[in-house]
Amino acid sequence: MLRKKYSVIILAAGQGKRMLSSIPKVMHKIAGRSMLQHLIDSVSKINIQSIYIVYNESLREFIPTIYSNKCTISIYWVLQESVRGTGYAVQQVLSMIHDDNEDILILYGDVPLISDKTLNNLCLMKSKCDIGLLTAYVKNPQGYGRIIRNQYGDVVSIIEDIDIVNQNDRIIKEIHSGIFISVSGYLKSWLNYLIENNLWCNELYLTAIIDIAYKNNFVINAIHPVDVCEVIGINNKSDLVKAERVYQIKEAQKLLELGVMISDLNRFDLRGKLVCGEDVCIDVNVIIEGCVSLGNRVKIGASCILKDVEIGDDVIIYPFSFIENSKIHCKSKIGPFARLRPGTCLQEQVHIGNFVELKNIKLGNNSKVGHLSYLGDADVGNYVNIGAGTIICNYNGKTKNYTCIEDNVFVGADSQLVAPITIGKNAVIGAGTTVTQNVDKDDVIISRVRQFSIVNDKVDKNKKN
């Protein structure tokens, strides 16, 4: 664990024109979180005290959505005064930092996959040098700044991709991720030198300080990330999609190593936190959002969506089911094509069939809702059977009303239960019944037009009434 506290500068003021979107680039999402949030979550795991985020005006409306999981970390938002390059952006923040001995970790908002392990390694290296760079070897370095080393292997400068004129420099495979660490006093001095000596063109590149530091005998070291994929830079939606898949495959691989059976690493999406018991099986195209807990021997069918769900042991979720903010106890079976909306709680061995929608409801042990039904705002007891096509009419146009169905009730197909209403134990509701009044226990209720037939050979069956 790092003992010294660091401050972090996140450069997030880029225009992101290549994203072709009205949404600021750093607010585009990977695994359900913005790129900026990914960075904040990573740096919050190391020993930092402050985060300075340099942003442009288009990001202002998104500021309330950004947070740190650690209350001890302060986040400062710094509006970029003018688009004059990364050097000026950092200098703007440095004017707010009065301790010239403070170590500053600089990150880029469009490099979101950096891990806390890599950042921790970079910070630890800082004790042995004046500048610590995060570099990587990549197959295709196009678009990245290249690391220039001398014959002894020392880093002497960084040349931006746009400024490369020498073919030998162009084929260099070691790239600068944009991420580095140094001391605030040094950064101030180097940037002031560049400005005072007019050693810049239209924009002041932060990377220009490396050449100055080397020529003044400062020690520059470089390390590589734990995984080269961490330094993927995102400039357009194609990059975003690639980064998403890289992230998801890594998360799926972690789950496999923990014993979870993921049918296809390329067809699994984790957009939150997943906790699993033993022998859990997850089929293809499953999406996990929010906080999801799966008990032992749970099976999730293809194309299911689970959002903020707690599922007990031996539960089977059949394909194409959507479950959110719900709790399902052990040995229950759900779906296919079931929808469980917020507030649903299923006790043990409950069966929910295809095309059933539940909302704000509790179903007791061994109760069944077979198919084609809607139940909302209700408390259903144990061993209740709800026939196909049953609807709880819980909304009168102004307010939602509550329904109570006690133990061992049988509700026939195509019934309507008009809330507020209570149905007593062991009652039977005949098929096609509309129930508008409370039903006592053991009662049998039928309310429908009696069937009758018309015998008339002269009736033209093809005539329209």
From Swiss-Prot:
One of its GO terms (biological process) is cell morphogenesis. HAMAP family: GlmU. It is an enzyme of class 2 (transferase). Homotrimer. One of its GO terms (cellular component) is cytoplasm. Residues 1-237 are annotated as: Pyrophosphorylase. UDP-N-acetyl-alpha-D-glucosamine binds at residues 11-14, 25, 80, 85-86, 108-110, 145, 160, 235, 341, 359, 374, 385. It catalyses: alpha-D-glucosamine 1-phosphate + acetyl-CoA = N-acetyl-alpha-D-glucosamine 1-phosphate + CoA + H(+); N-acetyl-alpha-D-glucosamine 1-phosphate + UTP + H(+) = UDP-N-acetyl-alpha-D-glucosamine + diphosphate. Residues 238-258 are annotated as: Linker. Coiled coil: none annotated. Catalyzes the last two sequential reactions in the de novo biosynthetic pathway for UDP-N-acetylglucosamine (UDP-GlcNAc). The C-terminal domain catalyzes the transfer of acetyl group from acetyl coenzyme A to glucosamine-1-phosphate (GlcN-1-P) to produce N-acetylglucosamine-1-phosphate (GlcNAc-1-P), which is converted into UDP-GlcNAc by the transfer of uridine 5-monophosphate (from uridine 5-triphosphate), a reaction catalyzed by the N-terminal domain. The keyword Cell membrane does not apply. This is Bifunctional protein GlmU. Its cofactor is Mg(2+). Binds 1 Mg(2+) ion per subunit. The lineage of its organism: Bacteria, Pseudomonadati, Pseudomonadota, Gammaproteobacteria, Enterobacterales. Mg(2+) binds at D110, N235. Transmembrane segments: none annotated. Residues 259-465 are annotated as: N-acetyltransferase. Its EC number is 2.7.7.23, 2.3.1.157. Pathway: Nucleotide-sugar biosynthesis; UDP-N-acetyl-alpha-D-glucosamine biosynthesis; N-acetyl-alpha-D-glucosamine 1-phosphate from alpha-D-glucosamine 6-phosphate (route II): step 2/2; Nucleotide-sugar biosynthesis; UDP-N-acetyl-alpha-D-glucosamine biosynthesis; UDP-N-acetyl-alpha-D-glucosamine from N-acetyl-alpha-D-glucosamine 1-phosphate: step 1/1; Bacterial outer membrane biogenesis; LPS lipid A biosynthesis. The active site is at H371. Keywords: Acyltransferase, Cell shape, Cell wall biogenesis/degradation, Cytoplasm, Magnesium, Metal-binding, Multifunctional enzyme, Nucleotidyltransferase, Peptidoglycan synthesis, Repeat, Transferase. It is found in: Cytoplasm. It holds the Pfam family NTP_transf_3. In the N-terminal section; belongs to the N-acetylglucosamine-1-phosphate uridyltransferase family. In the C-terminal section; belongs to the transferase hexapeptide repeat family. Acetyl-CoA binds at A388, N394, Y395, A431, R448.
